[in-house]
Amino acid sequence: MLLELARWLQQLESLFGLFNYLTFRGILAALTALFLSLWMGPAVIRKLAQFKGGQPIRQDGPQTHFSKAGTPTMGGSLILLTVTLSVLLWGDLRNRYVWLVLAVMICFGAIGWYDDWIKIVRRDPNGLKSRWKYLLQSIFGLAAGLFLYYTADVPAAITFYIPMFKSIALPLAGVSFVVIAYFWIVGFSNAVNLTDGLDGLAIMPTVLVACALGVFAYASGNVVFAEYLKIPLIPGAGELIIICSAIAGAGLGFLWFNTYPAMVFMGDIGALSLGAVLGTIAVIVRQEMVLVIMGGVFVIETLSVIIQVASFKLTGKRVFRMAPIHHHFELKGWPEPRVIVRFWIISVVLVLIGLATLKVR
């Protein structure tokens, strides 16, 4: 929105040419989302607190979690609102990737909102029935995959790449591309949701991964950097740095209120939408496997649930004391802040490894 105004004003004053730089607008997007979150946060939390009872607590969970009863949830609505406003202000609204990612965020956020609403109003910790949740996620995930396939304007946009092996590039047919896009979008949506079980546990890795994806998006959309780093050139992908920056700013603003002990929980409205956005951006910039590395915390949390369920069904025994795995460490006696910070440290290391693949090729 403001970009169009700046382009017009540039004819009168060359200083407005700064707005043509993605990095400059990325910084503004992050700061805008951050300050909006800090400013609007208290009012949003007070509004959410009107839903008496807050987030339902699992009866079979760690005993320390019962003190969280009554904490407002659906705080992810603050993230979605500030990200959307920031992107609309600083993003190039003629870019199809911007609108696709915003649409994915809003659609998956709507699923999460309804899931949270059921948990709060009906006092049902399970929320929306799994089959309906996965059906809606599948519809939106497949729609995003189809959109990306049929609007691809360069072969690189529908080619599968393996990190660190620049000679491996697998062209994808329609079905294979859409299936991969579906699994990454829906998979990471649920992976972030599974991780969101402790105060601040999910949002910090999300911020870190978003920042790293912003680097990949910027490089992928730049002819010089893409050629130098031997990564796929995706015209228009650079604009996604605005969304990544907005997520980083909004995420840090939300963490101000979500840090231990949390004043508000993100809820499914935030976790499902942010995970889907990370998956979508990774698919656009053709860095699906790098996302698996950088989002390793989300992957580990998901695998712990899969292993736990499979083991119990096959052998009647549990591998972990409780899944997702962050609860396992809680039940081993780790204080919640220790679990959170150590998972953050792991996330930092994994993101740095992911960024290193830019040169190790």
UniProtKB/Swiss-Prot annotation:
<dbReference type="Pfam" id="PF00953">
    <property type="entry name" value="Glycos_transf_4"/>
</dbReference>
<feature type="transmembrane region" description="Helical">
    <location>
        <begin position="25"/>
        <end position="45"/>
    </location>
</feature>
<keyword id="KW-0472">Membrane</keyword>
<dbReference type="GO" id="GO:0009252">
    <property type="term" value="P:peptidoglycan biosynthetic process"/>
</dbReference>
<feature type="transmembrane region" description="Helical">
    <location>
        <begin position="264"/>
        <end position="284"/>
    </location>
</feature>
<comment type="similarity">
    <text>Belongs to the glycosyltransferase 4 family. MraY subfamily.</text>
</comment>
<keyword id="KW-0460">Magnesium</keyword>
<dbReference type="GO" id="GO:0051992">
    <property type="term" value="F:UDP-N-acetylmuramoyl-L-alanyl-D-glutamyl-meso-2,6-diaminopimelyl-D-alanyl-D-alanine:undecaprenyl-phosphate transferase activity"/>
</dbReference>
<feature type="transmembrane region" description="Helical">
    <location>
        <begin position="73"/>
        <end position="93"/>
    </location>
</feature>
<feature type="transmembrane region" description="Helical">
    <location>
        <begin position="139"/>
        <end position="159"/>
    </location>
</feature>
<dbReference type="GO" id="GO:0008963">
    <property type="term" value="F:phospho-N-acetylmuramoyl-pentapeptide-transferase activity"/>
</dbReference>
<feature type="transmembrane region" description="Helical">
    <location>
        <begin position="339"/>
        <end position="359"/>
    </location>
</feature>
<keyword id="KW-0961">Cell wall biogenesis/degradation</keyword>
<feature type="transmembrane region" description="Helical">
    <location>
        <begin position="289"/>
        <end position="309"/>
    </location>
</feature>
<keyword id="KW-0131">Cell cycle</keyword>
<keyword id="KW-0479">Metal-binding</keyword>
<dbReference type="GO" id="GO:0051301">
    <property type="term" value="P:cell division"/>
</dbReference>
<dbReference type="GO" id="GO:0005886">
    <property type="term" value="C:plasma membrane"/>
</dbReference>
<comment type="function">
    <text>Catalyzes the initial step of the lipid cycle reactions in the biosynthesis of the cell wall peptidoglycan: transfers peptidoglycan precursor phospho-MurNAc-pentapeptide from UDP-MurNAc-pentapeptide onto the lipid carrier undecaprenyl phosphate, yielding undecaprenyl-pyrophosphoryl-MurNAc-pentapeptide, known as lipid I.</text>
</comment>
<keyword id="KW-1003">Cell membrane</keyword>
<keyword id="KW-0132">Cell division</keyword>
<protein>
    <recommendedName>
        <fullName>Phospho-N-acetylmuramoyl-pentapeptide-transferase</fullName>
        <ecNumber>2.7.8.13</ecNumber>
    </recommendedName>
</protein>
<dbReference type="GO" id="GO:0071555">
    <property type="term" value="P:cell wall organization"/>
</dbReference>
<comment type="pathway">
    <text>Cell wall biogenesis; peptidoglycan biosynthesis.</text>
</comment>
<dbReference type="GO" id="GO:0046872">
    <property type="term" value="F:metal ion binding"/>
</dbReference>
<keyword id="KW-0997">Cell inner membrane</keyword>
<feature type="transmembrane region" description="Helical">
    <location>
        <begin position="98"/>
        <end position="118"/>
    </location>
</feature>
<dbReference type="InterPro" id="IPR000715">
    <property type="entry name" value="Glycosyl_transferase_4"/>
</dbReference>
<feature type="transmembrane region" description="Helical">
    <location>
        <begin position="168"/>
        <end position="188"/>
    </location>
</feature>
<keyword id="KW-1133">Transmembrane helix</keyword>
<keyword id="KW-0808">Transferase</keyword>
<dbReference type="InterPro" id="IPR003524">
    <property type="entry name" value="PNAcMuramoyl-5peptid_Trfase"/>
</dbReference>
<keyword id="KW-0812">Transmembrane</keyword>
<keyword id="KW-0133">Cell shape</keyword>
<dbReference type="GO" id="GO:0008360">
    <property type="term" value="P:regulation of cell shape"/>
</dbReference>
<feature type="transmembrane region" description="Helical">
    <location>
        <begin position="200"/>
        <end position="220"/>
    </location>
</feature>
<keyword id="KW-0573">Peptidoglycan synthesis</keyword>
<dbReference type="InterPro" id="IPR018480">
    <property type="entry name" value="PNAcMuramoyl-5peptid_Trfase_CS"/>
</dbReference>
<feature type="transmembrane region" description="Helical">
    <location>
        <begin position="237"/>
        <end position="257"/>
    </location>
</feature>
